[in-house]
Amino acid sequence: MYSVNAPVPAAVNELAAELRPALTEFDRVRERHEQTLLVKRVPASDRKELRTAWQTAQDALSGAPAVEARVSEVDTFENPPNGSSPVVYLAVESPGIHRLHERLCSVFDPVPVMEGGDDYDPHVTLARDASGFQGQRAVDAIHGRQVGPVTWTIDELYLYDAEYGERVDTLSLPA
C-alpha cells in the first residue's frame, strides 16, 4: 500500500511515549518511526504505477499551502472498517489537512468508509488489538484522555511505501 502522509513532530512522538504504559494490553503498539499522519491512500500496485500516481498527486497539490495541525485528545475506533480492533489514536484537528485530503480525493477515488467527506478522521495510530475484559478496560482507561496540546505546521508531505516502511519521495508545502 502507498499513501501520501504528513510527518509528525517530536512533540507528538513524546506524547505517544508518555501514553505507552497505558497501551500494554494492546497486541500491537506503534513504534516511534511508525507514527505518521495519513493524508490519502494512493492507488498503485507497483513502483511504476506509483510514479504516475505520485505525479498526479503533486499536480493536485500544486499551490497548496502549509497547514496547521493540533493534537489534544486520545480517541478510539471501536470497529474500524478494516484491520483489527480496537484502534487507539491521537486525534488530529486540522481543517487544512482536510482540504489537502479533498484535493487528493478529487484525483483518486476515496477508499469507501474510510476516506472522503465525513469518513476521513485524521489521526496518529498508537495501538490496536485488545480483546476480552482486559482489552476493554485498557480502551476505557485511555479513550477521551486529554493530552498536550501539541500544535505544529505541516510544511511537507511524503509518499510512503508501507510494504517497505519507507519514504519514497517528499513534497514541500507550499507546493
Question: Where are the regions a protein language model picked out?
Answer:
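Short, flexible loop segments at boundaries between secondary-structure elements
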Residues: 144-160
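Basic, often amphipathic N-terminal segments
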Residues: 1-68, 96-148, 166-175
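Exposed loop/turn and edge beta-strand positions of beta-sandwich/beta-sheet ligand-binding modules
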Residues: 33, 84-86, 120, 153
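Short proline/glycine- and acidic-rich turn/helix-capping motifs at secondary-structure junctions
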Residues: 72-80, 120-122, 155-166
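Helix-adjacent hinge/juxtasegments
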Residues: 63-102
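Compositionally biased, intrinsically disordered low-complexity regions enriched in proline and serine
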Residues: 3, 90, 106, 159-161
